[in-house]
Every structure is written in C-alpha cells, then in structure tokens.
C-alpha cells in the first residue's frame, strides 16, 4: 500500500487491486484556501461517514460516483479516476463569495440554480473561469463541460430533496469530477459540510464549515448533528 496523494483533508493510497484506491479522511480543517487551519479530533470520521451516506443516496437515485464502499470510520474504497482540475459550484441561494463579487444580498434565492467553474490551482487561488477559459486551458471539451453542468444540476436536485427531508436548505455546494480510463466522467472527492453551505429551514443556522470560518460555533458538534439527521432518515 503506497501513499499516492495527500491533500488538505484526505490521503489516497494504492491497494492490491488495480481498480481500487483507499481514501483516508484526515482530522485537519482549513478555510480560506488553507489560510486558516486546525486539527480537530473526529473531523475525518464525520466527513467520511457523511460522504459515504450521501454517495450511497446519490447512487440509489441514479448518480454514479467513484465511491465503492466505506471501509472504516475514516476510510473509503473508491474507483481510480483522473481528477478534472475544476471545482464545480452550484448555487441555489446567494451567500459567500458571490455576494461580494456581484452584490447579491445574502440569502437571496435564485430563480434557477447557477453553475460556476473554478480552476483548481492553489498558486492562482482557484480563480473563477468561463467555459472558454476551460477550453483554452485544455481542461475539458465542449461535450465534457456540458456533461459536468448536467451532472451538477442532477446532483443538486437529489441533494435538495435530501436536505428538505432533514428540514434544511441547500444554499450551495462544491463538487469535483474525474475521468475513468474509458473516459467516463464520475462524481469524485467528497460531499460533506466541508463542501456544502447548508442552512436550517426555520432559523438559517449554519450546518456547514461557515461555523469554523466565522467562529460562530463548534464544527465537530455541528457536523455530528448533521450526521445524526442523515442517519435518522435511514
């Protein structure tokens, strides 16, 4: 078993199977592209369990991903994919960077979901890019871009239904995709309160990493409550 990659939140290892990788979720938490960072015991366990439940739910609703199964409290087995260097962001309600960038009021509900692409490049601080930029950078073709948008909106619909069942609102979320050896585009990485902005339907209280970004509550307690809500749906 060889360490293939280590990022801010996860480590990826080879296995004795060519078509399987092991993902280990770390206890590190970061914000502002790593400008703020801490280690919080239990954070890796929570994100692994939450992502595993959500990926299974998506699979049951026709959304394929790299996820195979949960191995332990902090580990998953996944299919190997070549990550497309784009963060695909879907926004249902204005919050975060878009309010600063375009002047939307925080909490303004969009008429329809907005899909944005951000170039995964730490040196450039993950800039917002257009479809034309993506093609100029040879990141993806027109067909790939259309597939990414379609899949992102399908995922949005399924996640909104899930959050509604938990009396929560899906404000926005960030996802990543990868390509298999045969060129199939699959959802990859994770879906957790680290990568989503989620509000309580009644109070707009955060159930996401904004409690850490803005120092408004305990990240571990917030994520545990979110996990409990997910498990209550089973």
Swiss-Prot record:
InterPro entries, per database record: SAICAR_synt/ADE2_N, SAICAR_synt_PurC, SAICAR_synth, SAICAR_synthetase, SAICAR_synthetase_CS
Superkingdom of origin organism: Bacteria
Disulfide bond positions: none
Enzyme class, spelled out: ligase
CDD domains reported for this sequence: SAICAR_synt_PurC
Homology family: Belongs to the SAICAR synthetase family.
Name the UniProt record assigns to this protein: Phosphoribosylaminoimidazole-succinocarboxamide synthase
Organism (species): Staphylococcus aureus (strain MRSA252)
Originating gene: purC
């Amino acid at each position: 078993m060889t360490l293939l990659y280590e990022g801010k939140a996860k480590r990826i290892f080879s296995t004795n199977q060519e078509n399987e990788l092991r993902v280990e979720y770390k206890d590190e938490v970061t914000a502002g592209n790593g400008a703020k960072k801490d280690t919080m015991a239990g954070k890796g366990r929570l994100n692994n369990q939450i992502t595993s439940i959500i990926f299974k739910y998506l699979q049951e609703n026709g959304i394929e991903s790299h996820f195979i199964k949960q191995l332990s409290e902090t580990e998953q087995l996944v299919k190997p994919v070549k990550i497309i260097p784009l963060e695909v962001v879907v926004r249902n309600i204005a919050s975060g960077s878009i309010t600063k960038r375009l002047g939307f009021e925080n909490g303004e509900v969009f008429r329809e979901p907005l899909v944005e692409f951000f170039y995964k490049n730490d040196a450039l601080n993950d800039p917002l890019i257009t479809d034309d930029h993506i093609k100029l950078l040879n990141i993806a073709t027109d067909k790939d871009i259309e597939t990414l948008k379609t899949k992102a909106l399908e995922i949005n619909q399924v996640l909104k239904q899930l959050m509604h069942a938990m009396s929560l609102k899906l404000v926005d979320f960030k996802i990543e995709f990868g390509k298999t050896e045969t060129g199939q585009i699959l959802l990859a990485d994770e879906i957790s309160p680290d990568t989503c902005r989620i509000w309580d339907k009644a109070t707009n209280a955060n159930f996401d990493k904004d409690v850490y970004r803005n120092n408004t509550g305990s990240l571990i307690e917030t994520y545990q409550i979110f996990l409990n809500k997910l498990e209550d749906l089973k």
